[in-house]
A protein has these predicted regions:
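Tandem repeat scaffolds
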Residues: 2-209
Length: 209
């Protein structure tokens, strides 16, 4: 396996296409530029990738277990099936990212920008989304059991009565929405057993009794 060096996008993608294997685990990749890279299936376990730019990258089935992703840019990245178990992604940019079926168990997404991110069928059990910005995010059929969304902001930013956040068919058992702004959110057919909505703004929300 090759250890990551300063390969250009073209060099890396050519090597990957030829079948070369890379090893990103435990590497120091602070503020590295991975824009547009095909990193599908790669292993970043326990790597330090704080502040790295993955915007537009293909991260399908990529492993980030134990990695440091604080302040990284994952906007427009495809993270379908990626594994992020028990790591911190605080203050990370995840705008328009795709997390379909991803494993984000116990991940810290506090203060992250999740605008229009797609978490459909993702596992967010025990995840921390404290003060995260979730307008337009899709959590359909996701598992947010005991997730903490305290002070999460799903406001529709002046877009009228459009749905701000989608929680359709998701499992929200025991989730904490204290002080969250969920105006116009859609909770249709979601499981909300033992959810905490103390002082949450649920104006015009659907599916909440």
């Amino acid at each position: 396996m090759l250890i990551m060096e300063d390969f250009s996008l073209e060099e890396y993608n050519a090597l990957k296409a030829s079948g070369v294997k890379f090893n990103f685990s435990e590497e120091n990749l602070v503020r590295r530029d991975f824009r547009g890279f095909d990193l599908s299936g790669e292993n970043f376990e326990s790597a330090n990738i704080e502040g790295a730019d993955f915007s537009g990258a293909n991260l399908t089935n990529t492993i980030f277990i134990g990695a440091n992703l604080k302040g990284a840019n994952l906007s427009n990245a495809n993270l379908t099936g990626a594994k992020f178990t028990k790591i911190g992604i605080r203050a990370t940019v995840l705008t328009d990212s795709i997390f379909i079926g991803a494993n984000l168990t116990d991940v810290d997404l506090s203060e992250a920008s999740l605008y229009r991110a797609n978490f459909q069928r993702a596992n967010l059990t025990g995840a921390i989304l404290l003060k995260s910005r979730i307008h337009g995010a899709n959590f359909r059929e996701a598992n947010l059991t005991y997730a903490n969304l305290t002070e999460a902001n799903g406001t529709n930013l002046g877009m009228g009565n459009s749905v701000s956040v989608f929680f359709n068919h998701s499992n929200l058992t025991g989730a904490n929405f204290t002080n969250a702004n969920l105006e116009n959110a859609d909770f249709s057919d979601a499981i909300t057993t033992n959810c905490i909505f103390d002082k949450a703004n649920l104006k015009n929300s659907m599916g909440i009794n």
